[in-house]
């Protein structure tokens, strides 16, 4: 039987937002339920994000988490969560100027 990854093992490389792939950074504003989140993205828009099944079972998401989001490209402002960043990864994103610190503080202050 295969063993799962331990809690402290490396998760691999941290994915970055890419204009070619269409991904962007977002912050979870509200957990709607049934595998959906309301996220505020760096472009200032609020989207409805779906958590894929493989993530839903393994990764818990809560308000204030920073996620990598892939919009579906339709007019109804929906998309899919690709990755959830850990606290140290969020600090790296802020240091690389990919994520405005004001956006993180704004959502954290609203809780």
UniProtKB/Swiss-Prot annotation:
* One Pfam family in the UniProt entry: eIF-1a
The record's section on PROSITE patterns has: IF1A (PS01262), S1_IF1_TYPE (PS50832)
Which InterPro entries does the record match to this protein?
A: NA-bd_OB-fold (IPR012340), RNA-binding_domain_S1_IF1 (IPR006196), TIF_eIF-1A (IPR001253), TIF_eIF-1A_CS (IPR018104)
The residues covered by the S1-like domain are 12-86
UniProt keywords, alphabetically: Initiation factor, Protein biosynthesis
Protein biosynthesis among the record's keywords? yes
Q: Which GO terms describe its molecular function?
A: RNA binding; translation initiation factor activity
Function description: Seems to be required for maximal rate of protein biosynthesis. Enhances ribosome dissociation into subunits and stabilizes the binding of the initiator Met-tRNA(I) to 40 S ribosomal subunits.
Against NCBIfam families, the record matches this protein to:
PRK04012.1-1 (NF003082), PRK04012.1-3 (NF003084)
Q: Which family does it belong to?
A: Belongs to the eIF-1A family.
The name of this protein is Translation initiation factor 1A
């Amino acid at each position: 039987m295969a063993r799962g990854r331990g809690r402290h093992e490396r998760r691999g490389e941290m994915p970055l937002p890419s204009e070619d792939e269409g991904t962007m950074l977002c912050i979870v504003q509200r957990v709607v339920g049934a595998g959906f989140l309301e996220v505020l993205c760096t472009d200032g828009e609020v989207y409805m994000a779906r958590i894929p099944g493989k993530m839903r079972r393994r990764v818990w998401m809560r308000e204030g988490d920073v996620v990598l989001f892939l919009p579906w490209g339709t007019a109804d402002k929906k998309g899919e969560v690709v990755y959830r960043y850990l606290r140290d990864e969020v600090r790296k994103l802020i240091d690389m100027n990919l994520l405005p610190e004001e956006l993180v503080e704004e959502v954290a202050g609203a809780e």
